């Protein structure tokens, strides 16, 4: 085909904004070297050529139709002409003198067919070989279309519709010819998504849109239509039929036909068990189809997706389809336009053709299209898939057929929050062989109008498959014009829509779908900004550039919101348009905050941060209905939103220090741009076995640094850098030095002139420096190396609270290299993480190689636990023969045990040894005993030591004595180590301080003497309660034993244990095999999943601890609906104690499934589809459930009742009570009523992170009031409380405090501190010694609270004495003496000062600013003017002057001064004497500068006279003949005209000059007129003729100057001129 394409790039700028747009590419074709204005036609014609000519379309058109052209095609012609306001009549012949519009069918023998045969050369095979073939010819006043049939002709007319939409004024049309056809037979879209169904208006509009671009199928398969699926056996009621009929008629009219899809396989499916049942069910389908045929439906489809295949096999599909084909063929006699093509979607719709089902289905007749999704649910139109499918599906005698692609794009079922506004070349691959495609339908979004860009793409692609990505991009770029207003014209609205759509493309899904790229131009700018921000460099200019970008996007969204080309589109995407506004406010606000931080403006930094935070929260509130719940719009999900989140997180550190001045946050910094392996938290964990390793690039440049920055200055006493990777200590800098910063920007060398070579461990002490950061920076480059960072320790304390230190580190053979994993995995307590080592010596591990632990000091060991091998890659890379050894000096080793694992299966080997007599060791290792040709894998190393376990520390000891006590703490118990010979004096105590306030369950206390001792508990260390019953306890953090007697008490402490009730996160207890992330099964996220890495056997179990006792009413086991690793036979059971189990769910029949079940999906094994869960389970998932269980449980397990050797086990979620949120912590520090929302825990109130928050669960607004209480457990001497809430939802909640002075005899009380009326709320407490609890009570508006900050003695109470003194000094001033404006400024400052003085919560900064403002207002007080004598005189004079008497220029200056003077006169009380005096000087000067106006003269007559003279010159000729003028006559007149023009053009010409010029010119004109030659001119002797006598008279007077009667040319003398004139007259 001819695809000689030229692109014309145009760019349009929005009138109301600046929008950066992609080029608008127009498809044009060059012929014969002629350049014309070519038409933009979609879908692109296969061949088009322009002849270079054009013609005018006549006002009235003559239309000629061949027989066979249907009414729908004729109606399309009418639409085309009416749109251009053209009238037409229909005739049977071409009419000369008119534009003829011809529409015909090839080989019809009609007028149009004959015209094309005679005038438009073409090959008849073109119509036989091509689909939907048509030719459009425009030339010589004839606009002609001929098609293979009426549908093809319709497509040709549709081509002309796009041409006519581009006609210029005057209706001129270019001459061209288009030979066109479709490359794919079936082109359209299917309503098969799971969201809200479209309205009939939506459906009709999309069918019309598709018809404009030659789509030919809309497949009706909405999930909510019961007659399509659940009630497929029932006929439609009449009211539903009328709706279907209307849509069918729209489909017939647009040729985008309504295809009715029936799903008879999911609910009460078609029966194939007996012929009688089958025939009965076939009859049901025929009756249904007959009903629809009678209502204009002309095409059908059968769906079997997401349903079980017939038990009798896939041949039943073929049987049904064949019988339906026969029946449809029979019906064609009644309905000639009925299509017998049958779409069929099998249950294996995401297969690759290799299944027995699809091979059998390939035996169906050729009219059957086999619908496939491209090899996976979110598949693509891909030639590789098509080739594989066709090859796999073929069997002997049945060659493979091309797939009919069902493409789930732009479907957003699994990305409901987003609009999918792009992805052309991702889902529709360029260059695919069209013979490999039977058809394509897109499955769109529930937002009908938003699909038009994708429908525009499939229309273009399926008609004329794109050759390359550029064509796909061009289509995307142009689509928004047609989506917005349906023509090729670019408008502000289409530009705006395209601009925001650039950033609404990505699906934000998992690996099951190829991610679509959005924000392509913006993303690199965002990344560059983040890197620059992280580096600490100035970001102001970059931030301003990004603000411009985001403002542009915000304006684009706003423009489209208010100026849509299509209001339906605007209304359907309004949630996203609104979201754009707030999302951009958030981005802009964060950037402005960053700028303010750089400029040191704390108030602006907080204000912008708070507004941004509120805007971002608000952006998540634009909810739209989705089936049975609300979803919330999100834009810019791939790059913009992550950028906003990143900025919010980064800024929160700095803003946090503004909100809480005493808060110090450490942040790891580096200018490496690659993502390291490991977690940045590893840097500060004081554990050298954890690390970060930078690998790409594998070099270290000069200037590369790693370090730490602080939100506020700290005192740096010592710093330690542990560099190099654990796998290779040489992965460090070649040379480096340490630097510190005081201001966060400028870096200073810590040790002048000191450099470290190949630093491994560096420590510098005794510094005593105030710093904001410290770093290690490379001073010399190093190639071929990674960069490892193990720890950065600042102000590390060498002393320890613990009785025994334990800091193990890894030891191993140095020749090994880490191939996969992180060595920190060996010490993380998780058997499912590990390391894979590459061995040297020809991939051989030599005898004597080892791996183990350096315990750091001699420790008594009671046991060891080593896990050799791992699951997954390298699972068989293990030693066969090895031994366990220990040593005290790393030289002399003692063997504990030898092992022979020869023949052991792949996977993990757990080595566990217990020692009856503890072993004292500092080193312990495994050592290889034979050479083995393998790499090596290890998963976990651990020791068991009662000495360590019971060593204790001082962290939880609570005492006011010098006793050497030690404590031990676990989550649910805190205790003191037994101690003898304790002596307590009066008021002394011993006890424990728990890690937080706890729900105390009981206390175990055993002492030898309790005389005079009392046991007490407290939540806060101030208020104490005596404990009388150790099993009935209040919440508390402190428990103490205090001597209340007056005598010393001596005793031995045998037991002091405080127990608490705790709940935990769900966790794995046990499983039959290892896994790749057990927590994912109980994390509440159905997108994550755990795989247990082995096939189950009968009796195998997977056991989870729910973390607490739960009343389970509903239990679901959820997996993806495509998951082949699902449980086939098993029971899911519940237990309260982990011993006694009750069945909740039964799966399968307990009989092992065969190998043929290996690729079966959950639905085929009896699971329910997600769409049956009422929105609880996603529609891409399947589940089994137990309902109405009403059982208390702590444990849940899967018990396998039959083996399945061919698959492992996957769990996406074990869902309790339909995903109901259950808190996984029992923390009485907070009391939330109602309970919080998931992810908004009360602990967020005190986590120091301004990006996390607490939010109560109002059950979608049903709960309208509540409270949250924060109980302080220490530092109750609070001076200031700061509460930060979301700026987007100001709650105005009451802030209450329970206060007291700490005295035993004084009762506490609740007082109100204030209300949450702002985003940042500050409350100062001067009146109470202690605040024990803070309670926030809300009504109507539930708060979203980021942080509660309390400040104690470090907060200095604001001092307002100076402000009050200045206020008192100025408040009584009288305004009579001062100018009004200066005194008004003072009043404003006084009012502000009073407001601040009256507000007990005013900060020092506010007080200081108010004082500064008051002082400035006082300084600027101006005394009023009193002397106006001169002012009045000069003003009176000025007002008396008349404007007309002076020049405009001088008056303009004067009038400005006069206006100012008059203004001063009106407001004399607002002027100082100096100002009045200056006005007098200025006004007097401007009066003196006035220039008198010269009277204007009238030049009209002179001008007219000049024009008269010029006319005479133009009309006259000099010569000797009658009617001519004497020679030289013009010269005299010309001279005078020039003189007159000089005067006329002189701006300051006087009236006298004008009159003189006029008189001179009048005389010149009179003289000129007197020189006109008449018949008698020269007849001096009066004889009535010119003769010799006249010549004699002239000759006689030659030289005379007095005889004027003979002077013909009036030059003052008789000369040769008169002789020549007389001679000429005599001779002629």
Swiss-Prot record:
Residue ranges constituting the GH84 domain according to the UniProt record: 185-466
Outcome of substituting residue 558 to E: In strain: CPN50
Gene Ontology CC entries for this record: extracellular region
EC number: 3.2.1.35
Known outcome of mutating residue 1042 to F: In strain: CPN50
Gene Ontology annotations of biological process type: carbohydrate derivative metabolic process; polysaccharide catabolic process
Catalytic activity: Random hydrolysis of (1->4)-linkages between N-acetyl-beta-D-glucosamine and D-glucuronate residues in hyaluronate
Name used for this protein in its record: Hyaluronoglucosaminidase
Lineage, top ranks: Bacteria, Bacillati, Bacillota, Clostridia, Eubacteriales
């Amino acid at each position: 085909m001819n695809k000689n394409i030229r692109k014309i790039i145009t760019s349009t700028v929005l009138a109301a904004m600046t929008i950066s747009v992609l080029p608008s590419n127009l498809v044009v074709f060059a012929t014969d070297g002629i350049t014309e204005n070519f038409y933009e036609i979609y879908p692109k014609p296969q061949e088009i050529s322009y002849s270079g000519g054009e013609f005018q379309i006549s006002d009235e058109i003559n239309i000629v139709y061949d027989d066979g052209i249907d009414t729908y095609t004729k109606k399309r012609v009418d639409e085309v002409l009416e749109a251009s306001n053209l009238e037409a009549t229909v005739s049977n012949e071409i009419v000369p003198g008119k534009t003829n519009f011809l529409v015909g069918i090839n080989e019809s023998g009609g007028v149009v067919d004959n015209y094309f045969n005679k005038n438009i050369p073409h090959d008849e095979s073109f119509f036989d070989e091509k689909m939907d073939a048509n030719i459009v010819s425009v030339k010589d006043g004839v606009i002609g279309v001929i098609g293979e049939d009426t549908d093809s002709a319709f497509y040709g007319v549709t081509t002309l519709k796009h041409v006519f939409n581009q006609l210029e004024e005057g209706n001129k049309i270019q001459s061209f010819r288009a030979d066109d056809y479709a490359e794919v037979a079936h082109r359209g879209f299917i309503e098969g998504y799971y969201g809200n169904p479209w309205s009939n208006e939506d459906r009709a509009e999309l069918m019309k849109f598709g018809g404009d671009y030659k789509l030919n199928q809309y497949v009706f398969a909405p999930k909510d239509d019961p007659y399509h699926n659940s009630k497929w056996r029932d006929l439609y009621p009449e009211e539903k039929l009328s709706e279907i009929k209307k849509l069918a008629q729209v489909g017939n009219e647009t040729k985008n036909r309504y295809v009715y899809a029936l799903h008879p396989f999911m609910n009460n499916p078609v029966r194939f068990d007996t012929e009688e049942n089958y025939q009965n069910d076939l009859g049901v389908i025929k009756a249904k189809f007959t009903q629809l045929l009678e209502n204009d439906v002309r095409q059908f489809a059968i769906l079997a997706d997401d349903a079980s295949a017939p038990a009798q096999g896939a041949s039943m599909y073929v049987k049904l389809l064949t019988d339906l084909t026969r029946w449809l063929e029979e019906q064609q006699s009644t309905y000639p336009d009925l299509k017998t093509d049958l779409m069929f979607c099998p249950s294996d719709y995401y297969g690759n053709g290799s299944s027995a089902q699809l091979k059998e289905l390939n035996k169906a007749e050729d009219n059957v299209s086999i619908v496939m999704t491209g090899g996976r649910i979110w598949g693509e139109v891909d030639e590789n898939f098509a080739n594989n499918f066709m090859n796999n599906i073929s069997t002997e005698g049945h060659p493979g057929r091309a797939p009919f692609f069902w493409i789930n794009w732009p479907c957003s079922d699994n990305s409901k929050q987003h609009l999918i506004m792009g992805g052309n070349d991702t889902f529709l691959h360029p260059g695919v062989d069209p013979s490999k495609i039977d058809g394509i339908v897109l499955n769109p979004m529930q937002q009908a109008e938003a699909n038009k860009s994708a429908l525009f793409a499939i229309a273009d692609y399926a008609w004329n498959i794109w050759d390359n990505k550029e064509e796909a991009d061009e289509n995307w770029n142009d689509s928004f014009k047609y989506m917005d207003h349906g023509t090729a014209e670019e408008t502000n609205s289409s530009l705006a829509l395209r601009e925001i759509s650039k950033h609404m493309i990505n699906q934000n899904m998992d690996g099951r779908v190829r991610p679509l790229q959005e924000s392509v131009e913006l993303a690199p700018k965002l990344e560059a900004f983040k890197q620059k921000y992280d580096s600490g460099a100035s970001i102001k200019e970059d931030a301003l550039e990004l603000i411009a970008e985001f403002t542009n996007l915000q304006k684009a969204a706003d423009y489209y919101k208010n100026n849509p080309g299509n209001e339906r589109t605007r209304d359907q995407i309004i949630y996203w348009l609104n979201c754009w506004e707030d999302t951009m406010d958030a981005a802009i606000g964060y950037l402005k905050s960053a700028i303010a931080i750089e400029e040191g403006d704390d108030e602006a930094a907080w204000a912008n941060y708070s507004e941004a935070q509120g805007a971002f929260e608000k952006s998540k509130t634009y909810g739209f209905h989705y089936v049975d719940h609300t979803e919330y719009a999100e834009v810019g999900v791939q790059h913009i939103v992550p950028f906003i989140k990143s900025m919010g997180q980064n800024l929160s550190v700095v803003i946090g220090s503004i909100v809480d001045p005493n808060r110090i946050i450490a942040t790891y910094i580096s200018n490496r741009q690659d993502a390291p392996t490991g977690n940045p938290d590893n840097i500060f964990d004081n554990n050298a076995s954890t690390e970060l390793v930078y690998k790409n690039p594998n070099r270290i440049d000069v200037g590369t640094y790693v370090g730490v920055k602080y939100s506020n200055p700290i005192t740096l006493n010592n710093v330690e850098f542990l560099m190099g990777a654990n796998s290779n200590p040489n992965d460090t800098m070649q040379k480096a030095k340490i630097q510190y910063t005081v201001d966060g920007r400028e870096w200073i060398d810590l040790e002048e002139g000191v450099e470290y070579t190949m630093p491994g461990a560096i420590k510098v002490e005794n510094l005593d420096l105030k710093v904001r950061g410290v770093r290690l920076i490379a001073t010399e480059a190093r190639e071929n190396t990674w960069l490892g960072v193990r720890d950065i320790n600042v102000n590390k304390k060498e002393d320890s609270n613990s009785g025994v230190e334990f800091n193990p580190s890894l030891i191993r053979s140095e020749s090994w290299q880490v191939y996969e994993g992180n060595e920190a995995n060996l010490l993380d307590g998780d058997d499912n993480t590990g390391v894979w080592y590459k061995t040297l010596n020809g991939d051989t591990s030599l005898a004597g190689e080892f791996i183990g632990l350096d315990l750091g000091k001699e420790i008594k060991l009671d046991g060891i636990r080593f896990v050799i091998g791992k699951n997954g890659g390298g699972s068989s890379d293990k030693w066969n023969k090895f031994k366990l050894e220990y040593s005290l000096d790393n030289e002399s080793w003692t063997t504990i045990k030898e092992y022979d694992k020869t023949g052991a299966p792949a996977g993990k080997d757990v080595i566990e040894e217990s020692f009856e007599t503890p072993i004292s060791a500092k080193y312990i290792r495994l050592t290889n005993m034979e050479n083995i040709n393998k790499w090596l894998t290890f998963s976990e190393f651990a020791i068991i030591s009662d000495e360590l376990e019971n060593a204790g520390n001082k962290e939880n000891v609570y005492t006011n004595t010098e006793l050497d006590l030690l404590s031990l703490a676990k989550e649910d118990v805190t205790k003191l180590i037994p101690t003898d010979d304790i002596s307590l004096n009066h008021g002394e105590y011993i006890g424990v301080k728990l890690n937080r306030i706890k729900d105390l369950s009981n206390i175990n206390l055993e002492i030898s003497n309790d005389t005079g001792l009392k046991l007490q508990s407290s939540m806060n260390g101030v208020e104490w309660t005596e404990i009388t019953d150790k099993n009935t306890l209040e919440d508390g953090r402190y428990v103490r034993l205090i001597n209340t007697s007056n005598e010393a008490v001596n005793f031995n402490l045998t037991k002091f244990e405080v127990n608490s009730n705790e709940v935990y996160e769900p966790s794995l207890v046990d499983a039959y095999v290892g896994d790749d992330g057990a927590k994912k099964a109980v994390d509440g996220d159905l997108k994550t999943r755990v795989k247990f890495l082995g096939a189950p056997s009968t009796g195998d179990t997977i056991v989870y601890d729910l973390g607490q006792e739960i009343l389970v009413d509903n239990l679901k086991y959820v997996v993806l609906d495509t998951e082949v690793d699902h449980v086939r036979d098993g029971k899911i059971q519940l237990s309260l104690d982990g011993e006694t189990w009750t069945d909740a769910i039964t799966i399968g029949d307990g009989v092992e499934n065969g190998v043929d079940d290996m690729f079966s999906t959950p639905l085929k094994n009896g699971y329910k589809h997600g769409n049956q869960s009422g929105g609880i389970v996603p529609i891409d998932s399947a589940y089994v459930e137990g309902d109405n269980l009403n059982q208390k449980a702590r444990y849940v397990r899967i018990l396998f009742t039959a083996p399945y050797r061919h698959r492992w086990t996957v769990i996406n979620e074990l869902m309790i009570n339909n995903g109901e949120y259950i808190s996984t912590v029992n923390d009485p520090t907070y009391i939330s009523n109602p309970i919080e929302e998931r992810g908004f825990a009360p602990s967020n109130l005190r986590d120091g992170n301004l990006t996390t928050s607490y939010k109560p669960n109002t059950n979608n607004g049903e709960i309208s009031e509540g409270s949250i209480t924060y109980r302080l457990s220490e530092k109750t001497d609070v001076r200031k409380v700061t509460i930060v809430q979301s700026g987007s939802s100001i709650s105005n909640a009451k802030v209450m405090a329970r206060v007291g002075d700490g005295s035993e005899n004084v009762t506490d009380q609740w007082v109100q501190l204030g209300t949450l009326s702002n985003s940042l709320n500050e409350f100062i407490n001067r009146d109470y010694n202690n605040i024990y609890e803070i309670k926030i009570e809300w009504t109507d508006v539930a708060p979203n609270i980021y942080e509660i900050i309390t400040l104690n003695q470090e907060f200095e109470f604001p001092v307002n004495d100076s402000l009050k003194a200045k206020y008192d000094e100025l408040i009584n001033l009288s305004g009579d003496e001062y100018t009004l404006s200066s005194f008004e400024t003072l009043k404003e400052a006084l009012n502000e000062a009073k407001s601040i003085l009256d507000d007990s919560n005013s900060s020092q900064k506010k007080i200081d600013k108010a004082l500064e403002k008051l002082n400035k207002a006082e300084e600027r007080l101006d005394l009023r003017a009193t002397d106006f004598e001169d002012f009045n005189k000069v003003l009176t004079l000025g007002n008396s002057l008349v404007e007309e008497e002076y020049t405009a220029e001088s008056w303009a200056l004067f009038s400005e001064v006069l206006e100012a003077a008059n203004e001063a006169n009106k407001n004399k009380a607002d002027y100082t004497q100096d100002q009045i005096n200056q006005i007098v000087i200025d006004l007097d000067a401007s009066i003196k500068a006035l220039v008198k106006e010269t009277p204007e003269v009238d030049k009209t007559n002179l001008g007219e006279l000049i024009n008269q003279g010029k006319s005479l010159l133009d009309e006259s000729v000099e010569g000797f003949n009658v009617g001519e003028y004497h020679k030289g006559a013009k010269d005299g007149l010309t001279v005078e005209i020039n003189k007159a023009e000089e005067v006329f053009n002189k701006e300051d010409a006087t009236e006298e000059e004008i009159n003189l010029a006029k008189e001179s010119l009048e005389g010149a004109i009179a003289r000129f007129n007197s020189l006109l030659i008449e018949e008698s001119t020269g007849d001096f002797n009066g004889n009535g003729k010119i003769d010799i006598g006249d010549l004699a008279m002239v000759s006689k007077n030659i030289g005379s100057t007095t005889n004027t009667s003979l002077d013909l040319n009036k030059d003052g003398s008789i000369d040769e001129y008169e002789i020549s004139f007389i001679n000429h007259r005599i001779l002629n």
